[in-house]
Amino acid sequence: MTETESAILAHARRCAPAESCGFVVRTPEGERYFPCVNISGEPEAYFRMSPEDWLQAEMQGEIVALVHSHPGGLPWLSEADRRLQVQSDLPWWLVCRGAIYKFRCVPHLTGRRFEHGVTDCYTLFRDAYHLAGIEMPDFHREDDWWRNGQNLYLDNLEATGLYQVPLSAAQPGDVLLCCFGSSVPNHAAIYCGDGELLHHIPEQLSKRERYTDKWQRRTHSLWRHRAWRASAFTGICNDLAAASTFV
């Protein structure tokens, strides 16, 4: 554990049951934690920083992360957290249950423009799992790899912690592999439950839609991560809710 992380955890303990808040700042002397005062009217439920604290942190160096805690709460960013994180364009570090969870500032899961290898179906899958607390590797992938004798999903899923489950056992958070104009599975979608999936296909914005007969016919197999737990879907749901109310 770094000195910065120790300072973050100590500050959260001192503030509990209220939420702590602060910044990780990169200074000429190295990375340090800059604690702030939570000026929220409901500090046990929300956090709010003063503009003065934000300015003082910026004067110390480059802000590299915003930090807050969920005392007795859940280790995923809330709907409000995700909305504010995207606005801040910063990584957010969350203190919960004596640990620090670090979240990259990924775009909202819905409404993304498609760019192969940058914001495509695998990026959406990877970012959704990141918000759920599971890290998936990034890797280079040429466009149309499925037409060049490659089978990237089937060749890599087991090595990254997933295993195949029967389609009849589908649970929210499972990954659907589909054949989209291909003889091999070349498209990943997140099953959301209630007959819905979350995915990103070329020339469209990422979206939730019904898991219709069309997509059921295209489905090759269903996969689940070994570290997955049902409550992890909360992290994905919170982002979907944040995006639906984002103005």
Outline where the language-model segments fall.
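Glycine- and charge-enriched low-complexity intrinsically disordered segments
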Residues: 209-247
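Active-site nucleophilic cysteine motif
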Residues: 116-132
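Surface-exposed patches in mature extracellular/periplasmic domains of secreted proteins
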Residues: 136-141
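...with weaker cross-activation on analogous glycine-rich loops/strands in unrelated enzymes
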Residues: 142-206, 211-212
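Extended, compositionally biased flexible segments
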Residues: 58-74, 205-206, 210-221
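Second-shell loop/turn segments in exported
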Residues: 110-115
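Conserved beta-strand-loop surface patch within small alpha/beta domains used
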Residues: 1-65, 71-103
